Amino acid sequence: MSRIALGLAYDGSAWQGWQTQPHGVTVQDQVEAALASFAGGGGPVATVCAGRTDTGVHAAMQVIHLDTDLQRRDESWVRGVNAFLPPSIVVQWARPVSEAFHARFSARSRTYVYLLWRGRVRPALWAGRAGWAFQPLDVPAMRAAARALLGEHDFSSFRSSQCQARHPVRTLHRLDIDERGAFLVFTLRANAFLHHMVRNLIGALLQVGQGREPVAWMDALLCARDRRLGAPTFMPDGLYLSAIEYPAEFGFDELDGGITLLSPFTGALG
């Protein structure tokens, strides 16, 4: 039995999140069915992912692992599994890893990117792939509010009521807000994220950007540790799991899908 790691990308618009469900309309169900078909239909295949994305959330870089007796070249895994996947899900790479590697528990950090369209009307060509806010936004105020969120905190004010995490303390290493033409690009990196945490952070930052709350509100909200005082959960459309960081011992040089996500649109984004 050997352990294989796969790097995935997917458009989450048509899927009800990553995690398997009885109805089978999830990314995990599609991936495991494709793996079983590639393996010859010898039985179910179980996978573990780095980060469980919600309904409508995308991934430019998702990492999974599985244990298998199947021996194939790395490129055979990529092309063979992709032959059984729908167009919106793709295996980008495959490689053998040691038994010590765990897609979820070995990860040091996860990075999410949120693409927000600031046009007067909703972005038809980005439907399902970018969030939208038509009101004018005070970006410097949003950046000032974001600084209060950096570091290790109890993020109870930004977790959903369905969150199953054992504790709400997370370390937010990075929260950048970049203006690129009609887009705002939010980049958030943390050791791990709570359920709906990124979308709740974006929603709160927009409250500040729209002038509905002062900059100091963000720190007060963080200290309150009460989700009921926060902003509504923002739409999932523009949210992408973009990078996973692992210790050097596992030999992953660069697992940043954000480069691929943004590079084709450099001109459009400014």
UniProtKB/Swiss-Prot annotation:
UniProt entry keywords in alphabetical sequence: Isomerase, tRNA processing
| Gene Ontology terms describing biological process | tRNA pseudouridine synthesis
Could you describe the subunit structure of this protein? Homodimer.
Q: Which EC number applies?
A: 5.4.99.12
Q: Extract the CDD domains matched here.
A: PseudoU_synth_EcTruA
Q: What is the recorded function of this protein according to its Swiss-Prot or TrEMBL entry?
A: Formation of pseudouridine at positions 38, 39 and 40 in the anticodon stem and loop of transfer RNAs.
Q: Which residues cross the membrane?
A: none
User: What does it catalyze?
Assistant: uridine(38/39/40) in tRNA = pseudouridine(38/39/40) in tRNA
Q: This protein is called what? A: tRNA pseudouridine synthase A
Task: Please name the catalytic residues of this protein.
Answer: 54
Q: Which residues bind substrate?
A: 112
